Curated annotation (Swiss-Prot):
Subunit structure: Homodimer.
Record's function text: Catalyzes the attachment of tryptophan to tRNA(Trp).
Known EC number: 6.1.1.2
InterPro entries: aa-tRNA-synth_Ic, Rossmann-like_a/b/a_fold, Trp-tRNA-ligase, Trp-tRNA-ligase_bac-type, Trp-tRNA_synthetase
Short motif 'HIGH' region, span: 12-20
Keyword vocabulary terms for this entry: Aminoacyl-tRNA synthetase, ATP-binding, Cytoplasm, Ligase, Nucleotide-binding, Protein biosynthesis
Gene: trpS
An example Gene Ontology biological process: tryptophanyl-tRNA aminoacylation
Name of this protein: Tryptophan--tRNA ligase
Amino-acid positions noted as binding L-tryptophan in the UniProt annotation, renumbered to this chain: D135
Organism this protein belongs to: Vibrio cholerae serotype O1 (strain ATCC 39315 / El Tor Inaba N16961)
Catalysis performed (reactions): tRNA(Trp) + L-tryptophan + ATP = L-tryptophyl-tRNA(Trp) + AMP + diphosphate + H(+)
Coiled-coil blocks: none
GO cellular component: cytosol
Matches recorded under Pfam families: tRNA-synt_1b (PF00579)
């Protein structure tokens, strides 16, 4: 029996955060046995905002090495760099022709990014969700892990796929209609200084962010200064509405130790101050990341291995993608290359 197909990508722009790890990358490793996983480093998406070429080059290799370091197995999953599989851009162009301007102009992320990068609001940024749709539809993905910021894009991918199928292949649909993958455990990590906002790797205030490769001393320092509250006496309780800072730290501690919120609350019942709890959270996060960081350094220094992973991944991905692209080209009436 074939496994459900999953597609997910990671951007090689900026340092990946612990939020990227807990919310996506660790999940990637856990899904490999039960799903047919397609994982890509989405460098085509990265250039929708201006990138330094050398920095993008290095960040792409960094992201690939991180995927491997967290446990993505190239023998179980298809791991590749997006620009190495030209079918993504080819299908993206076709899908552009079946996407309405009004649909794209309603995308919340475009509004947010165009405000942030007001000096470079390019067509690629506007059409970003269409390329994302191509990423998904090329592989017949049944499920797509998405955060709240990408949910609208997945809905658009579903609309584009349905529209194309209805025009060209209502009886035998070319595109699979993807569903969101909902993780059993919510691993949403919030900003350290303002726990009402999601942690973002691109946050200008670096005190808000813990990066995946961050120095242990820096991690502990940031957590020691993280937002708590002024409740007297101090109370460790998972209450997102009234104790957002403590709830965020509890989430990190739970992710790092495997303890439930109830167990954490019992462990710290009757505390006189938040300092000892913060100390334990910092040490637990460092212990969680240390093996990943060590494995990353080993893999990142083995360029021959990275090259082999990229080469094999691109070949596997392209073979799958080409099957879909041929069906699409035939459906719209393109003449096949002799």
């Amino acid at each position: 029996m074939s496994k459900p197909i999953v597609l997910s990508g990671v951007q090689p722009s900026g340092e990946l955060s612990i939020g990227n790890y807990l919310g996506a990358l660790r999940q990637w490793q856990q899904m490999q046995d039960d799903y047919d996983c397609q994982y890509c480093v989405v460098d085509l998406h990265a250039i929708t905002v201006r990138q330094d070429p050398q920095a993008l080059h290095e960040a792409t290799l960094d992201a690939l090495a991180i995927c491997l370091a967290v446990g993505v197995d190239p023998k179980k999953s298809t791991l590749f760099v997006q620009s190495h599989v030209p079918e993504h851009a080819q299908l993206g162009w076709v899908l552009n022709c079946y996407t309405q301007m009004g649909e794209l102009s309603r995308m919340t992320q475009f509004k947010d990014k165009s405000a942030r990068y007001a000096n470079d609001v390019n067509a690629g940024l506007f059409g970003y969700p269409v390329l994302m749709a191509a990423d998904i539809l090329l592989y017949g993905a049944h499920q797509v892990p998405v955060g709240s910021d990408q949910k609208q894009h997945l809905e658009l991918a579903r609309d584009i796929a349905t529209r194309f199928n209805n025009i060209y292949s209502p009886e035998q649909p070319i595109f699979t209609i993807p569903e969101p993958y909902i993780p059993t455990v919510n691993a949403r990590v919030m900003s350290l200084q303002d726990a009402t906002k999601k942690m973002s790797k691109s946050d200008d205030n670096r005190k808000n962010v813990i990066t995946l490769l961050e120095d242990p001393k820096s991690i502990i320092k940031k957590i020691n200064k993280a937002q708590t509250d002024a409740e007297t006496p101090p109370r460790i309780a998972y209450d997102v509405e009234n104790k957002a800072g403590i709830a965020n730290l509890m989430g990190l501690y739970s992710a790092a130790t495997g303890k439930t919120f109830a167990e954490i609350e019992a462990q710290y019942a009757g505390v006189e101050m938040y300092g000892p709890f913060k100390k334990d959270v910092g040490e637990a996060v460092v212990a969680m990341l240390e093996p990943v960081q060590a494995e990353y350094q080993r893999i990142r220094n083995d360029r021959e291995y990275l090259n082999s992973v990229m080469r094999d991944g691109a070949e596997k991905a392209s073979a799958k993608a080409l099957q879909t692209l041929k069906k699409v080209y035939a459906a719209v009436g393109f003449v096949a290359r002799p």
